[in-house]
Amino acid sequence: MNRLYIVFICLAALSSCEKVWEDDLQEKALDAVRGRYEIASAVWEGTEPIDIDGDGNASYDYYAEWNQVDVGWHPQHTVNNRLGRLDIPYTYCENDHWGGLVFLERRYERLEFDIEVVIEGGESRLEFTLPDEDSQLTLSGYGELTLRTDVTFTVIVSPEETREVTGPVLFKFKRIEYISGE
């Protein structure tokens, strides 16, 4: 009976160690993505180049096109001072998100997503929620994230004419600041 009791205590201790190990692994994985990021590049992956800044020159360089958009035609089209910055963790209004990317200060040009670290078989992976189910967010290097997702944005053709475009964009982010989890 004593041996069975000792085996039971050892199994209980061993199972609690595994939980601590998983928690530690999850915290390390979260720590690896925590921070403030800037866009290093954004590439339009559509079949044809796009011209979203209305200058007549189409390009696959989504970031360059996007940065040249004249948002001054209309008072509501103001560039947010956090243009192109990704924060993990991120809080906007009353919604808590593990990630948030601000394009322009307009409701429909804000991309917010939740990131969760999932532990399976001793390996961690990032899981996240975006409107586009085919989106992929990966930790591509130390302090580097890659996000491939469909983006819908408004093209201001003239003060009187706008159009919406949706298509795949590959974003690459570089961490510029660590955000502590404490």
Protein language model annotation of sequence segments:
Residues 1-17:
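Sec-dependent bacterial lipoprotein signal peptides
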Residues 13-44, 173-182:
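Bacterial Sec-dependent N-terminal signal peptides
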Residues 45-49, 93-101, 152-165:
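Short, cysteine-centered beta-strand-loop-beta hairpins and adjacent loop/turn segments enriched
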Residues 60-71, 77:
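Short solvent-exposed strand/turn elements
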Residues 45, 71-146, 174-176:
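Contiguous, well-ordered beta-strand patches that form the walls/edges
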Residues 50-64:
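Acidic, glycine-anchored loop motifs typical of Ca2+
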Residues 143-182:
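Edge beta-strand at a domain terminus
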